[in-house]
């Protein structure tokens, strides 16, 4: 499927994210490593715009974590020619098993709903590299590393770099994450900071060879399935990636670091062991395999919904405007939907003077949906982390009866899946644009 070309090719700047250094390991400061920004560069590049991506890092680094590529995201990558690169490295899930925290008792097995397409999982670096490779293969997309943005102008658009350079353009896209510099300038409010949710996550990646020695662990990495263990104030999600050569494990738990500013910290192996003391023996086996120096802990943060995502010829996308908790696996997907919507509206204009108006259509197309998805993640956290007791017993009974499609875990619930996975961000943006143009024509005839 050929991507439609823009009526007016624009000069677009995409501002990426900063890195925090942890010894010899570099970890991006937010959950998704520049996926939204690179997706914006790709879709705009395919439509004929000239795109410069500015990354603050001197070199893009691999981030050791997995990601779920949900159908609403994969649908867009299909159109943009990235799917073959993704499928060369992914695992297509067939089932998700939900187990009790202490004894591993199976609470329910849900087949993956393929009504809206495949649900695949992949190493974040493999996904990021697939998008980068596809984008940078275009002659009109370039990536400039070691380019830290310190200021932005809104109309006409430009960015100032730490080295004193000023780059002028038609549009600036702020894809610089939950600690966004562009957002602070856009809102003229530096008080909108990430707020700790009280949760944190360990993310570990285990190589196949160390799991093959135990038959139970070998089965986990061999099968095209995700496993979720749920318990009081905690849960774990795990699945194979990189064609079953790595096993991704995310362990969510109460944050013990208080108001510490760092988004990512080196974690303690002993603290991880203590956090999951008394959990299923399979969980403890997985934790035992983790190298003492490979424990990284992510603080899960949000900020309150913004009054606006746009100003002049500047727009925010992804975690810069709607950071997501990982409980419905939509953080990267919503950033990619933002990118898709921008690609549509910026390619529909007939003159540069329409850019601010196009961005207002982008916001109308995206803001309510993204913030609704954001809220659904927060709600799912409560369900998954119930303490043992009457509510937990009732929830577990629902898992057993979930063959009907109604599921207490929103990720596996059919109605929630239809809302999340059935959405076509490009169609929604085009519909919003066409409705807007129809209203403009109607008003002109009054």
Stretch-by-stretch model annotation:
Residues 2-13, 26-28, 56, 60-72:
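Accessory recognition modules or surfaces
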Residues 2-10, 26, 106, 285, ...:
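C-terminal helical "tail/cap" subdomain of flavin- and related membrane-associated enzymes
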Residues 9, 14-24, 30-57, 173-174, ...:
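Conserved mid-domain beta->alpha element of the FAD-binding
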Residues 48, 81, 140:
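Short glycine-rich hinge loops at helix-strand junctions in the catalytic core
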Residues 55-58, 108-115, 254-258:
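Short glycine/proline- and charge-enriched loop/turn segments
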Residues 62-134, 150, 230, 384-386, ...:
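Active-site-adjacent segment of FAD-dependent monooxygenases/related oxidoreductases
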Residues 64, 80-81, 90, 110, ...:
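Short, flexible helix/strand-to-coil boundary loops that buttress conserved ligand/catalytic motifs
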Residues 97, 103, 130-292:
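Conserved FAD-binding catalytic core of PHBH/FMO-like flavoproteins
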């Amino acid at each position: 499927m050929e991507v439609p070309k823009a009526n007016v090719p624009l000069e677009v700047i995409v501002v990426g994210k900063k890195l925090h250094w942890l010894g010899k390991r570099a970890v991006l400061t937010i959950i998704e490593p520049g996926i939204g920004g690179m997706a914006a560069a790709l879709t705009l590049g395919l439509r004929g715009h000239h795109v410069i991506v500015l990354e603050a890092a001197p070199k893009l680094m691999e981030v050791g974590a997995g990601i779920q590529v949900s159908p609403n995201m994969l649908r867009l990558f299909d159109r943009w020619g990235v799917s073959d690169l993704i499928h060369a490295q992914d695992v297509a899930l067939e089932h998700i098993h939900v187990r009790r925290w202490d004894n591993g008792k199976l609470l329910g097995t849900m087949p993956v709903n393929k009504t809206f397409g495949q649900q695949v999982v992949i190493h974040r670096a493999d996904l990021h590299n697939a998008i980068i490779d596809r984008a940078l293969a275009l002659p009109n997309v370039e990536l400039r590393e070691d380019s830290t943005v310190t200021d932005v102008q809104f109309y006409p658009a430009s960015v100032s770099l730490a080295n004193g350079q000023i780059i002028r353009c038609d549009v600036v896209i702020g894809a610089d994450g939950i600690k966004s510099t562009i957002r602070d300038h856009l809102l003229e409010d530096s008080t909108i900071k990430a707020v700790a949710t009280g949760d944190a996550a360990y993310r570990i990646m285990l190589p196949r060879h160390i799991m093959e020695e135990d038959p139970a662990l070998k089965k986990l990495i061999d099968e095209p399935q995700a496993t979720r263990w749920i318990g009081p104030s905690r849960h774990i999600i795990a699945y194979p990636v990189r064609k079953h050569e790595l096993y991704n494990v995310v362990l969510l738990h109460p944050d013990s670091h208080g108001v510490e500013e760092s988004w990512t910290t080196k974690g303690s192996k002993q603290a991880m062991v203590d956090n999951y003391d008394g959990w299923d023996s399979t969980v403890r086996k997985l934790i035992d395999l983790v190298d003492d120096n490979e424990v990284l802990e992510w603080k899960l943060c949000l900020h309150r919904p913004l009054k606006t995502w746009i100003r002049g010829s500047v727009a925010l996308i992804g975690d810069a405007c709607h950071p997501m908790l990982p409980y419905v696996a939509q953080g990267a997907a919503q950033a990619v939907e933002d990118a898709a919507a921008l690609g549509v509206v910026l390619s529909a204009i007939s003159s540069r003077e329409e850019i601010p108006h196009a961005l207002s259509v982008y916001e109308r197309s995206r803001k309510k949906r993204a913030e609704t998805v954001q809220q659904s993640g927060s709600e799912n956290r409560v369900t998954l982390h119930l303490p043992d007791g009457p509510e937990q017993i009732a929830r577990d009974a629902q898992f057993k009866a979930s063959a009907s499609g109604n599921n207490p875990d929103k990720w596996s619930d059919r109605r929630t899946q239809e809302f999340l996975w059935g959405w076509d961000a490009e169609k929604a943006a085009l519909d919003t644009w066409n409705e807007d143009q129809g209203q403009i024509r109607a008003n002109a005839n009054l």
